[in-house]
């Protein structure tokens, strides 16, 4: 039977989005580029097969699933495996299959802890187990978003007393796996242009992922800030410590004034 894991709090042990994808791709020899691709449920099914051989009807898992009803079928297989191994976790299938970053990221963070608590280190050939199948990429994940308007970074109508510093959230985008290099000695200019466009699209998707992740965590910090402001008159030392951490900045960092040239420098 499985070792159940109930802690879902954010800790320093939680992996970042990039580290989580790297762990999944390395463990299952997949080529995922987005957390949202976990919405098919196929990766979780194979992880269960790795942890508890025979607990999942892996042959019934649709690794090439592209439609929501196929995702739901995969999660039903996962639920059956959970029940068979005594896993108490309730799978929020209706949320996961929508392919939203936040829901899928929270679930995979729990699953990573569950995996670590149950993995015994035995050898496992993921490609052979799934008979060479590769996961499909949903059309919405590969369509270039060249004309998609960007959401403003600050959309709150009520400005905080002191803005939360977000200078650490700007990360250099890295091209994810999946870009196929062609032999430079074969093909022509059209092939090179197509390859460059593919790389540009991958980078754009990576940037969008980073922006989603940034907004996700910034929203959590903003909620914490509002709670602190609502209770600031209580003189609670723990509350004051939280406020100090929220407003802490790196040495030498100056919060730019609203309006003026500084805002233009932040655009990219």
From Swiss-Prot:
Segments of skewed composition (Low complexity): 146-160
Main location: cytoplasm
Localization: Cytoplasm, Cytoskeleton; Cytoplasm, Cytoskeleton, Microtubule organizing center, Centrosome; Golgi apparatus; Cytoplasm, Cytoskeleton, Spindle
GO-annotated biological processes: attachment of mitotic spindle microtubules to kinetochore; cell division; establishment of mitotic spindle orientation; negative regulation of microtubule polymerization; protein localization to astral microtubule; protein localization to microtubule
Modified residues (N6-crotonyllysine): 66
N6-acetyllysine modified-residue sites: 220
Annotated protein name in UniProt: Microtubule-associated protein RP/EB family member 1
Species of origin: Pongo abelii
Origin organism lineage: Eukaryota, Metazoa, Chordata, Craniata, Vertebrata
GN (gene name): MAPRE1
């Amino acid at each position: 039977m499985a070792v159940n894991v109930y802690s879902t709090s954010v800790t320093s042990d939680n992996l970042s989005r990039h580290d989580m994808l790297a762990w999944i791709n390395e463990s299952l020899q997949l080529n995922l580029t987005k957390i949202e691709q976990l919405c098919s449920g196929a990766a979780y099914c194979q992880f269960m097969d790795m942890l508890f051989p025979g607990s999942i009807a892996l042959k019934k898992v649709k690794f090439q699933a592209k439609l929501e009803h196929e995702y739901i079928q995969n999660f039903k297989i996962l639920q059956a495996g959970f029940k068979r191994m005594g896993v108490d976790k309730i799978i929020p299938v209706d949320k996961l299959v929508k392919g939203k970053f936040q829901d899928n990221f929270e679930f995979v963070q729990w699953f990573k802890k569950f995996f670590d608590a149950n993995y015994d280190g035995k050898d496992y050939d993921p490609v052979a187990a799934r008979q060479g199948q590769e996961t499909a990429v949903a059309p919405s994940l590969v369509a270039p978003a060249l004309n998609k308007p960007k959401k403003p970074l600050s959309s709150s109508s009520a400005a905080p007393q002191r803005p939360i510093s977000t200078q650490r959230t700007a990360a250099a985008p890295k091209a994810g796996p999946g870009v196929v290099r062609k032999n430079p000695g074969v093909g022509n200019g059209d092939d090179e242009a197509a390859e460059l466009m593919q790389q540009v699209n991958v980078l754009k998707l990576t940037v969008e992922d980073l922006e989603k992740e940034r907004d996700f965590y910034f929203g959590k910090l903003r909620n914490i800030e509002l709670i602190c402001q609502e209770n600031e008159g209580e003189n609670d030392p723990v509350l004051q410590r939280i406020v100090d951490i929220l407003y802490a900045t790196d040495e030498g960092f100056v919060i730019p004034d609203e309006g003026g040239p500084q805002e233009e420098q932040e655009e990219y």
